[in-house]
């Protein structure tokens, strides 16, 4: 039985009128269990899995490869890439007992996703989105948290209509990415668009795009009048973002090392996470010397250059600044 207080809807209720809910975005490859555990240590309220293809999730090998969790992995929303309500019903039935919510991806702009009829291809099919929401609700119950993530359209009336369809379908949360599916990630997020469409529904709306710091996120929430803020790249660079740190604290790196070994994170993902979060505490030249062959060799490199505390040592995971060895 999942903890009712970890229900994403309950979290929005608890924070109403206080502060926006802090959310770690679904990131392909990167939103794995060790990273989810890490950002929770730093004031992240809700975390997502990477987008998982629902049709692959129906196969045991697909589930094993894409999804792992534990009792501490809450509040957790699993995001599906899906266009078939029947497949979604089956996938929801399999995963329902192990998550706190299911998200439906209607925002992925990648060409392959659009060709598959998932992600932002669904922005043009409100009726299908309605059926997908109903598939989750009919399978897991009306009280089970269901979220839909969308992008804005060039015609905001189209976005408003889709949001209203989503709300009437019974969804509990809508996340709005402030770029169109044609916009590159380097294109500035359109906060005015999020601000304009938010009042068209009564359920919580989350602003997504360019949340690179807590300060920036709070400014976005205030301007758009949204109830939540979602960060992706900002959290990759600084998993302690929602705790107010402007740069990754050293203790965050120590915790990440521990979680990665505890949950056997894929080495290539581990390497990318580590070098990204150490971007502001090391030079590019230094990072180029970090070994690329094994976790053990990376640990040797870190121990050679920094004081790295282990979980059984005082001040593990608490330091702000790294202590270098010279």
From Swiss-Prot:
One of its GO terms (molecular function) is tRNA-dihydrouridine20a synthase activity. Pfam families: Dus. This is tRNA-dihydrouridine(20a/20b) synthase [NAD(P)+]. Its EC number is 1.3.1.90, 1.3.1.-. The keyword Flavoprotein applies. It catalyses: 5,6-dihydrouridine(20a) in tRNA + NADP(+) = uridine(20a) in tRNA + NADPH + H(+); 5,6-dihydrouridine(20a) in tRNA + NAD(+) = uridine(20a) in tRNA + NADH + H(+); 5,6-dihydrouridine(20b) in tRNA + NAD(+) = uridine(20b) in tRNA + NADH + H(+); 5,6-dihydrouridine(20b) in tRNA + NADP(+) = uridine(20b) in tRNA + NADPH + H(+). Disulfide bonds: none annotated. Belongs to the Dus family. Dus4 subfamily. Catalyzes the synthesis of dihydrouridine, a modified base found in the D-loop of most tRNAs. Also able to mediate dihydrouridylation of some mRNAs, thereby affecting their translation. Its cofactor is FMN. InterPro entries: Aldolase_TIM (IPR013785), DUS-like_FMN-bd (IPR035587), DUS_fam (IPR001269), tRNA_hU_synthase_CS (IPR018517). It comes from the Eukaryota. It is found in: Mitochondrion. It comes from Schizosaccharomyces pombe (strain 972 / ATCC 24843). One of its GO terms (biological process) is mRNA processing. The active site is at 108 (proton donor). Keywords: Flavoprotein, FMN, Mitochondrion, mRNA processing, NAD, NADP, Oxidoreductase, tRNA processing. GO terms for cellular component: mitochondrion. FMN binds at residues 26-28, 79, 149, 177, 208-210, 232-233.
């Amino acid at each position: 039985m999942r903890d009712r207080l970890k229900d994403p809807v309950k979290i929005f209720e608890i924070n109403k009128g206080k502060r926006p809910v802090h959310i770690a975005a679904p990131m392909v490859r990167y939103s794995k269990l060790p990273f989810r555990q890490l950002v929770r240590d730093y004031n992240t309220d809700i975390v997502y899995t990477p987008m998982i293809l629902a049709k692959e999730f129906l196969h045991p090998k697909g589930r094993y490869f894409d999804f792992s969790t534990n009792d501490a992995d809450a509040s957790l929303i699993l995001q599906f890439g899906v266009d078939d309500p029947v497949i979604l019903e089956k996938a929801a039935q399999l995963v329902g007992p192990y998550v706190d919510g299911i998200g439906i991806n209607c925002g992925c702009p990648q060409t392959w996703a659009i060709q598959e009829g998932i992600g932002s291809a669904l922005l043009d099919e409100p009726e299908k989105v309605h059926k997908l929401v109903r598939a989750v609700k009919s399978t897991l119950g009306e009280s089970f948290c269901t979220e839909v993530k969308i992008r804005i359209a060039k015609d905001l009336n189209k976005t408003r209509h889709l949001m209203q369809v989503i709300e009437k379908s019974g969804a509990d949360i809508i996340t709005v990415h402030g770029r169109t599916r044609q916009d590159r990630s380097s294109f500035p997020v359109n906060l005015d668009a999020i601000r304009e469409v938010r009042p068209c529904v009564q359920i919580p709306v989350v602003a997504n795009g360019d949340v690179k710091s807590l300060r920036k996120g709070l400014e976005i929430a205030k301007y758009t009048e949204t109830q939540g803020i979602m960060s992706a790249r900002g959290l990759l660079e600084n998993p302690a973002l929602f705790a107010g740190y402007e740069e990754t604290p050293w203790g965050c790196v120590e915790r990440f090392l521990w979680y990665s070994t505890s949950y056997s994170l894929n080495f290539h993902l581990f390497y990318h996470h580590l070098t990204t979060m150490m971007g502001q505490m090391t030079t590019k030249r230094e990072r180029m010397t970090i070994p690329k062959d094994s976790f053990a060799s990376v640990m040797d490199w870190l121990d050679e250059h920094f004081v790295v505390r282990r979980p059984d040592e005082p001040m593990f995971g608490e330091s702000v600044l790294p202590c270098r060895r010279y």
